[in-house]
């Protein structure tokens, strides 16, 4: 789908920002460019839509040499998302989303319908169409920035640290949301980031650059298990090199499949009684279809017992979750990094499938850190 052949960028004075890069990207692939500041990751991405002109080499999109195309027309066929979002403050959300379709002379009704379709994909209703950017939160604005890039149905989308300015909770939520969206729409993504956790979480393959050259290309697993050299090891970080047991790769293989749950219509007394019976201090709240709604713990009940009567009055909906097909290492990292006690496991429709607890990860982390040493001692 996207092919870079011996692509270089040399600035005046002879400074090489990018040096003879070769890369093949398949249709529907999610590629992350990552590396230290000045490594050439953003320059490489900007050469793909000719915001920066290559000094030499060739770039092909669907077999066509981009240097033989009008740069303005080229950019209209490529989605582009930046950290600063770049929504026009005087335009409504619908007008912002429809910007490129309007330039492509789509009929007005088709533009409106496309905006409605896209909002639905990120769980935003049609009432947002006539609002202005200042009426939205930072996370909502960034969602609109992503939707604008998708509006004209481009096969390729370039993203330059799009979630870098967001708070950690919003950032994590948008990453999950966008990865799901990418799988659904099967778009080819080139994503620039400085955050290795983000690259590991999102990418099908990671491209690590240093001083304008590619040092290693591989899946997150390949790079974590077999760093190309000392630079890659140091860039990844020792804590990220903690590996899960080789026989336990995905969350669903080791999750507890019978988490303790409660419905929102149960009384606080019933919830406390259930906690006592199951010897737990919190419960996952689900509806009749077993869709996860949030959680309630003993502290919430204690603080609200005089002014609330049912679980639905006190439970919290802001809860970290992972997909049951997620790699186990991502869950290990989330639990350890965020300091949380457990992570609910859900399917694509947010049905509760299980739970991974902090305690259940102790053996896995122990084996990851000490397993090799113990094996070596046993062979001495």
Swiss-Prot record:
Involved in a high affinity multicomponent binding-protein-dependent transport system for glycine betaine, carnitine and choline; probably responsible for energy coupling to the transport system. Residues 255-314, 315-373 form the CBS domain. GO terms for biological process: amino acid transport; glycine betaine transport. Induction: Repressed by OpcR. This is Glycine betaine/carnitine/choline transport ATP-binding protein OpuCA. Residues 2-236 form the ABC transporter domain. Belongs to the ABC transporter superfamily. Binds cyclic di-AMP (c-di-AMP), which may regulate the transporter activity. The complex is composed of two ATP-binding proteins (OpuCA), two transmembrane proteins (OpuCB and OpuCD) and a solute-binding protein (OpuCC). It holds the Pfam family ABC_tran. GO terms for cellular component: membrane. It comes from Bacillus subtilis (strain 168). SMART domains: AAA, CBS. The keyword Repeat applies. ATP binds at residues 35-42.
């Amino acid at each position: 789908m996207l092919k870079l052949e011996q692509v270089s960028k040399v600035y005046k004075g002879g400074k090489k920002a990018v040096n003879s890069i070769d890369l093949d990207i398949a249709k529907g692939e999610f590629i992350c460019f990552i590396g230290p500041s000045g490594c050439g990751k953003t320059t490489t991405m900007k050469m793909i839509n000719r915001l920066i002109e290559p000094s030499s080499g060739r770039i092909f999109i669907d077999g066509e040499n981009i240097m033989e195309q009008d740069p303005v027309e080229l950019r209209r066929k490529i989605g582009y998302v930046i950290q600063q979002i770049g929504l026009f403050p005087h335009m409504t959300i619908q007008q912002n989303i429809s910007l490129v379709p309007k330039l492509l002379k789509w009929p007005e009704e088709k533009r409106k319908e496309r905006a409605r379709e896209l909002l639905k994909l990120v769980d935003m209703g049609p009432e947002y169409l006539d609002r202005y950017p200042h009426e939205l939160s930072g996370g909502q604005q960034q969602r609109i920035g992503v939707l604008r890039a998708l509006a004209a149905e481009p096969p390729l989308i370039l993203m330059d640290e799009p979630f870098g300015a967001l708070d950690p909770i919003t950032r994590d939520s948008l990453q999950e949301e966008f990865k799901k969206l990418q799988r659904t729409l099967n778009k080819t993504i080139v994503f620039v980031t400085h955050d290795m956790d983000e690259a590991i979480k999102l990418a099908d393959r990671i491209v690590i650059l240093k001083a304008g050259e590619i040092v290693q290309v591989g899946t997150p697993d390949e790079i974590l298990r077999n760093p190309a050299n000392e630079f890659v090891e140091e860039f990844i970080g020792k804590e990220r090199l903690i590996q899960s047991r080789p026989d336990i790769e995905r969350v669903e293989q080791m999750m507890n499949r019978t988490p303790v749950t409660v419905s929102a219509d149960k009384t606080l007394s019933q919830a406390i009684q259930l906690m006592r019976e199951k010897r737990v201090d919190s419960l996952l709240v689900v509806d009749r279809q077993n869709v996860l709604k949030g959680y309630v713990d003993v502290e919430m009940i204690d603080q609200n017992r005089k002014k609330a009567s049912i679980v639905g009055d006190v439970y919290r909906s802001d809860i970290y979750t992972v997909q049951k097909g997620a790699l186990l290492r991502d869950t290990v990292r989330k639990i350890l990094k965020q300091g949380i006690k457990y992570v609910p496991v859900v399917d694509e429709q947010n049905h509760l499938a299980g739970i991974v607890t902090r305690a259940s990860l102790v053996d896995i982390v122990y084996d990851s850190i000490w397993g090799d040493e113990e094996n070596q001692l046993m062979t001495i």
